Amino acid sequence: MKIFSKIIIGFLFLSFILSSCNNTTTYAEQLKAEKELIADYIKRNNIKVVTEEPKVWDENVYLLTESGLYFHLINVGDSAAPAEVLDTNDLVVPRFYQYTLNAKADTISNWNTVDYPYPTTFNYLDDSQACAAWHEAVSYMKYNNSRAKFIVKSKIGFEDASTAVTPYIYDMKIKFQK
């Protein structure tokens, strides 16, 4: 009986030791990898990062905001109609591509949702309907038919990106309804 007890205790001890050793990465390591991936993407694409909003958006100039959003305005949109400026709770209808930042980018979403019976929409500044990064990007876009590219860190992205600590780049064009 003593031998049997020793075998059981030994087995329990061994299983405890083996279960405490795992090869998963820590959250801090995932954040570091995310930061490195973004830095590598910026370098590979010759992106110039600025901290003040440029008056003229040159090619490959991205604004780094306090939240960590990298934003580049491609097209101002319909700025000739000042009455058509985006306002709180306006319904935003985005068309967007979502890519990974890997050297060989994967297209995660390739949506032209405007043509869908139920397009992707959200109310501007209603945080329950879109991620913080989308609201911030749209705040810089302001006008119908505005187009921008932006890099979204996991912390300000959608929940699935946050859980996986995965940054994405979006190429987005917006329309909105008052």
Enumerate the predicted regions with their spans.
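Bacterial N-terminal signal peptides that target proteins for export
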Residues: 1-9
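Short acidic-hydrophobic surface loop/beta-edge motif
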Residues: 8, 62-66, 148-150
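C-terminal motif of bacterial Sec signal peptides marking the signal peptidase cleavage site
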Residues: 17-20
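Start-of-domain signal
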Residues: 22-90
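A short beta-strand signature
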Residues: 88-103
